A protein has these predicted regions:
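Conserved glycine-rich Rossmann-like NAD(P)H-binding loop of the short-chain dehydrogenase/reductase
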Residues: 79-95
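Residue(s) in the substrate-gating loop at a strand-loop-helix junction
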Residues: 192
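A glycine/serine/threonine-rich, flexible loop-to-helix segment
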Residues: 153, 201-203, 225, 232-258, ...
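Conserved mid-core segment of classical short-chain dehydrogenase/reductases
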Residues: 14, 116, 121, 142-160, ...
Length: 297
């Protein structure tokens, strides 16, 4: 009988750390280096295959978490990347830029608070000036702050910050970037399981993620005749600095997932790469659910 080489299979249940995690508390926006366990962005594992060769990408919130993993994956697939961060995230952004350049691609880190329309417009102008245009727009930056004490604990200041960061910024950036995006370009938004199964302590955040789903569906139909696709990724629990910085108890984070653990940022990036690539040429208006088994519509 012919011999067959045994395929190497990876058990997703035990692939990455599982809760309980050590107690940890950070001030917003949190630090990757201070997390235990440290998030995996694919530094040692992601291998590119030229799927995005020569593409020009603009990614918001690229300093850490999912954003860093996406920037790394895009670069290793051949894209040049402009990404945003807040002033207090400069050290994190420097590491993301290093990973992009290590892949042999252009990295431009831009301080930008997307709650302000003028900064969004300036960001797009900066990206076009640095890269010559925009082929990929990833609206990933977001803000959340858990309020287990109910709606009364959500201040107008917090509500406004969540809305401006998660919705207004996405709207302004998409509107400005489209003037520089050719046929074949792609918009990818970061939605969330919270948009479908909202947690009571993330009321305002969940509202915005549900809105992102509707925005993506409408935008895809609007842009189809221009040859530009629009999709979103809806992650489940992902181990990023936002968790110890915004959640009251991160020790059990992700245990409710059918896989029994949170995702690592590196596990989200391939979905963005696929949607950005020509392999998804007939896919638009879709929400790719990456929840570890939690069923969504």
């Amino acid at each position: 009988m012919p011999s067959h080489e045994q395929a190497h299979l990876t058990d997703p249940v035990g692939l990455h750390p599982r809760p309980p995690f050590p107690e940890q508390d950070q001030d917003h926006p949190g630090s990757t280096e201070a997390m235990d366990p440290r998030p995996d962005h694919g530094e040692a594992t992601y291998q590119g295959h030229g799927l995005l060769h020569g593409r020009r990408a603009l990614v918001t919130g690229g300093d850490s978490g999912i954003g860093r993993a996406v920037c790394l994956a895009f670069a290793r697939e051949g894209a040049d990347v402009v990404f945003t961060h807040l002033p207090e995230e400069a050290d994190e952004a420097e590491e993301t830029a290093r990973l992009i350049r290590q892949a042999g691609r252009t990295a431009v880190a831009v301080v930008c608070d997307i709650r302000h329309e003028d900064e969004c417009t300036a960001l797009v102008d900066k990206a076009v000036g640095e890269l010559g245009g925009i082929d990929l727009l990833v609206n990933n930056a977001a803000y959340q702050m858990a309020q287990p004490d109910g709606i009364e604990a959500i201040t107008t200041e917090q509500f406004d910050r969540v809305m401006k960061t998660n919705l207004y910024g996405m709207f302004w950036l998409t509107k400005a970037a489209l003037a520089h995006m050719p046929p074949g370009a792609s918009v990818i938004n970061t939605a969330s399981v919270q948009g479908y199964q909202p947690s009571p302590h993330l009321l305002d955040y969940a509202m915005t993620k549900s809105a992102i789903v509707s925005f993506t569906h409408s935008l895809a139909q609007m842009l189809a005749e221009r040859g530009i696709r629009a999709n979103a990724v809806a992650p489940g629990p992902v181990w990023t600095p936002l968790i110890p910085a915004t959640m009251p108890d991160p020790t059990k984070f992700g245990e409710q997932s059918p896989l029994g653990r949170p995702a690592q940022p590196a596990e989200m990036a391939p979905a963005y790469v696929f949607l950005a690539s020509d392999r998804a040429s007939y896919i638009t208006g879709e929400i790719v659910n990456a929840t570890g088994g939690t069923p969504l519509p």
